[in-house]
Every structure is written in structure tokens, then in C-alpha cells.
From Swiss-Prot:
Its main location: membrane. Disruption phenotype: Lymph nodes of cd53-deleted mice are smaller than wild-type mice due to a marked reduction in B-cells and T-cells. Cd53-deleted B-cell progenitors have diminished IL-7 signal transduction resulting in altered gene expression and increased apoptosis of developing B cells. Mice have largely normal hematopoietic stem cells under homeostatic conditions but they display a prolonged cycling in response to stress. Cd53-deficient myeloid cells have also a reduced capacity to undergo transendothelial migration. Induction: Expression rapidly increases in hematopoietic stem cells during stress. InterPro entries: Tetraspanin/Peripherin, Tetraspanin_animals, Tetraspanin_CS, Tetraspanin_EC2_sf. Keywords: Cell junction, Cell membrane, Glycoprotein, Membrane, Transmembrane, Transmembrane helix. GO terms for cellular component: cell-cell junction; immunological synapse; plasma membrane. Residues 1-11, 70-80, 207-219 are cytoplasmic. PANTHER family: LEUKOCYTE SURFACE ANTIGEN CD53, TETRASPANIN. It comes from Mus musculus (Mouse). Glycans are attached at residues 119, 129, 148. The keyword Secreted does not apply. This is Leukocyte surface antigen CD53. CDD domains: CD53_like_LEL. The keyword Transmembrane helix applies.
Amino acid sequence: MGMSSLKLLKYVLFIFNLLFWVCGCCILGFGIYFLVQNTYGVLFRNLPFLTLGNILVIVGSIIMVVAFLGCMGSIKENKCLLMSFFVLLLIILLAEVTIAILLFVYEQKLNTLVAEGLNDSIQHYHSDNSTMKAWDFIQTQLQCCGVNGSSDWTSGPPSSCPSGADVQGCYNKAKSWFHSNFLYIGIITICVCVIQVLGMSFALTLNCQIDKTSQALGL
């Protein structure tokens, strides 16, 4: 019974992490592509590293490293790798909870910083190609114009701005989009946390099962 439980846990955890490793590779690949193509540009000039490409590369790399530890730890029945996998998942989970709390506590300050960053970047639209790409992408996708409206463009709105007198500014449009999709964002966030907790549970259970099997075999 002990050996069959060990094998089942081992392969469940291996397949679980293999799927996430493949997902990590895909995310990393998209991130590298966006970095090379510089498709979406830089929106916040005071945070030049905060681009879609960089975020995807970091997230993809973290997923790949954690999933690799989980794969190798489970298939090799290596307690050290399994505990490393467990600890990394725990650190990531705690970091996510901390970030969520900070975002909630400092929501007003964050809103102010975002508005200031957008107002600053819009001044460099014509002088910085990367900023131009970022603004063109956002205005096209959200069907908005400027930070608070088309009047933000002192020299006239660019072609990426939709026409019409009732066009919203991108700051309020982005906030509206976030609030209208808050339920879906919350569900996705909860699912990610549940998956992480499941991964930690599998790793800890497999680690304990390895101990029990070793004791039963007299190792």
C-alpha cells in the first residue's frame, strides 16, 4: 500500500509540475518575443523595466525554476528538492498575499502615482518611440484618449485616439475595466493560490510518504 501510494503521488506531482513547466516555457518565450520586438513600449518612464516583456520573462522564469524542482524532486524522490519546491511555493504565496494587502492599503497613493506617471509619459509621446508605442497600444485597445481626455494632447490627439466627443481618458477607462472584471480577476487569483497550496500539499505528502516507505524498508 505504501509503495503504490508513493508511486501515485510521485507521478501526480510530476505531471502537475511538467504542465506548469511547459506553461512557464511558453510565457518566457512570449516575454522574449515582446522584448525583442518592443511591441508595447514603455508606459512609465520612471519605471522603464516595467514592461509586458520583462514581466512575462520574470514570471515565466520563476514558473520554470519552481516546476523543474517539483519535477525532479518527485521523479527522483529527492527530499531536498521537494522541500526546496515547497519553500519556494510558500515564499511566492506569502509574497502574493503581501502585495495584495499593500495594494489594498495604499490604493489611493497608488492611484496618484499611476496618474502622475501617465501624465509624465504623455509629455514624451513625440520624443520617445517606446512611449509612443505604449500609448498607441493602450488607446487602441481600450478605445480611450489621453490620461483624462483628448485635451491632454496639447498638440492635438494622435491617430490612435478614437474620434468622438464622449471618449473617456485612459486612466478612468482602465479603472472601469478593472472594476468591471474584478470578479474574474479575483477568481483567477484564488485559483492560482489554490494550485500553489495543492502543489505544496503534494510535495509535503510525498516527502512524508518517502520517509514512511524508507522506514518500512529499513533504509
